[in-house]
């Protein structure tokens, strides 16, 4: 599912909201998550999961084409850990779909 499909689904489930308003809300939520992560904050959505930033140290890498060793700078990468409720729901739905197959 891409962002536009998410916006469309939310708008369909909430007919009192205009699709443009839903799009603005979704964009605002995503912007706030990114801003918080950029500050180094952890963003926790209970039952859904938690977003955080992991810092990877500088290391020696290798160019796969030439085999040459190259330095790779340190970097920060986003990390998402699923919440307990999400894991349980996914496992429950997977078990149900496998049983009916």
UniProtKB/Swiss-Prot annotation:
Q: Which GO terms describe its biological process?
A: DNA recombination; regulation of DNA-templated transcription; regulation of translation
Q: Which InterPro entries match?
A: Hist_DNA-bd, Histone-like_DNA-bd_CS, IHF-like_DNA-bd_dom_sf, IHF_beta
Q: Does the keyword Transcription apply?
A: yes
One GO cellular component term of this record is: cytosol
Task: Identify one Pfam family in the record.
Answer: Bac_DNA_binding
Cross-referenced SMART domains, in alphabetical order? Answer: BHL
Taxonomy, superkingdom? Bacteria
Q: Please list the GO terms describing molecular function.
A: DNA binding; structural constituent of chromatin
> Which controlled-vocabulary keywords does the entry list?
DNA recombination, DNA-binding, Transcription, Transcription regulation, Translation regulation
Q: Which family does it belong to?
A: Belongs to the bacterial histone-like protein family.
Q: What does this protein do?
A: This protein is one of the two subunits of integration host factor, a specific DNA-binding protein that functions in genetic recombination as well as in transcriptional and translational control.
Q: How does it assemble?
A: Heterodimer of an alpha and a beta chain.
Q: Report the NCBIfam families cross-referenced here.
A: hip (TIGR00988), PRK00199.1 (NF001222)
- Name of the featured protein: Integration host factor subunit beta
């Amino acid at each position: 599912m891409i962002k536009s499909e998410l916006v469309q689904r939310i708008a369909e489930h909430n007919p009192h909201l205009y699709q443009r308003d839903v799009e603005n809300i979704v964009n605002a939520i995503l912007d706030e998550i990114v801003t918080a992560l950029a500050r180094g904050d952890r963003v926790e959505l209970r039952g859904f999961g938690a977003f955080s930033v992991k810092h990877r140290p500088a290391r020696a890498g290798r160019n796969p084409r030439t085999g040459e060793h190259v330095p790779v700078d340190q970097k920060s990468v986003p990390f998402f850990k699923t919440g307990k409720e999400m894991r349980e729901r996914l496992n429950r739905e997977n078990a149900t779909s496998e049983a009916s197959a």
